């Protein structure tokens, strides 16, 4: 799994997040990013050490290199040790990442680092639950484009950390004919989807083609042209089974639309190749992480939640 921070988009997003929280108006004499409160109250020579950990069990780690990148962007002299790799499952209060550096710099970096990790760990943890629920059937668990604007690179990476797979990264890397496209193609003729697939292939011969269908009739039309994927949208499990049989050896099948964790196993049992889930990125919430640190000289102790 490629490190998410190798992506230029990820690096740019980290920079934007720090600009949002810290701006560039307040810098110390060495040019470090910092917050106004630390400038006023914290000894510039104070050095702190600490860890990030999950307060609950079963958390799937995601975003450790992002947190490290945040800290290094604030102050390159902060030492960061990754204790648990992305994709690891941790116990309550088990350290994920350790750090040492100027207290002012750590105070400046901590919230942004935690914001990234809390969201990414939540997505990875929810993805893992769906993967575990469907693994008996070998069903792929896919994400969607229902991501937070500007943060897609992190959220889709977090899905990988949880054992899921990425659907298309954007509208540029796969042809996906949804209901609105179908309505605009020959007046929405359900018996002309094979012709739509052929038109898409002529326009973009190097891209996979996927067609969303909502009925057995539409599936029968689409599969004639053998698109790489057929998306079964909001179908009953009984109809999914019929579509899977219809598409066998011709097209892969993707179940989509309102699939909950309770229903995931039943959907996977229909034999679909994959299930796609918007909830992985738009409803995962946030994992309760804590960053605890200690000032090396003196007795001051602090915790940020």
PLM segments and residue spans:
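Acidic/glycine-rich phosphate/pyrophosphate-binding loops and surrounding catalytic core
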Residues: 1-225, 229, 238-246, 252-254, ...
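Active-site core of metal-dependent hydrolases
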Residues: 232
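Short beta->alpha hinge that forms the Motif I/post-I loop of the SAM-binding pocket
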Residues: 235
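Short, charged, intrinsically disordered terminal tails
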Residues: 279-305
């Amino acid at each position: 799994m490629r490190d998410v921070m190798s992506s230029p988009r990820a690096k740019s997003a980290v920079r934007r997040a720090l600009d949002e929280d810290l701006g560039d108006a307040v810098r110390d004499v060495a040019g470090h990013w910092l917050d106004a409160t630390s400038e006023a109250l914290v000894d510039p020579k104070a050095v702190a050490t600490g860890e990030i950990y999950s307060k609950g069990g079963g958390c799937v780690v995601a975003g450790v290199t992002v947190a490290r990148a945040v800290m290094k962007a604030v102050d390159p002299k902060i030492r960061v040790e990754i204790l648990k790799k992305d994709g690891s499952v941790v116990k309550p209060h088990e350290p994920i990442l350790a750090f040492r550096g100027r207290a002012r710099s750590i105070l400046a970096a901590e919230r942004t680092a935690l914001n990234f990790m809390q969201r990414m760990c939540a997505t990875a943890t929810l993805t893992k639950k769906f993967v575990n629920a469907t693994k008996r059937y070998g069903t792929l668990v896919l994400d969607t484009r229902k991501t937070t604007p500007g943060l897609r690179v992190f959220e889709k990476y977090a899905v990988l950390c949880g054992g899921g797979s990425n659907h298309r990264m954007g509208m540029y890397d796969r042809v996906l004919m949804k209901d609105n496209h179908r309505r605009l193609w020959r007046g929405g003729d359900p018996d002309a989807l094979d012709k739509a697939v052929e038109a898409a292939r002529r326009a973009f011969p190097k891209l996979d083609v996927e067609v969303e269908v909502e009925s057995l009739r539409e599936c029968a039309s689409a599969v004639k042209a053998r698109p790489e994927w057929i998306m079964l949208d909001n179908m009953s499990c009984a109809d999914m089974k019929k579509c899977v049989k219809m598409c066998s050896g011709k097209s892969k099948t993707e179940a989509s639309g309102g699939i909950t964790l309770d229903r995931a196993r039943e959907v996977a049992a229909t034999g679909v190749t994959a299930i796609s889930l918007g909830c992985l990125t738009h409803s995962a919430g946030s994992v309760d992480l804590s960053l605890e640190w200690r000032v090396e000289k003196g007795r001051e102790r602090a915790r940020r939640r």
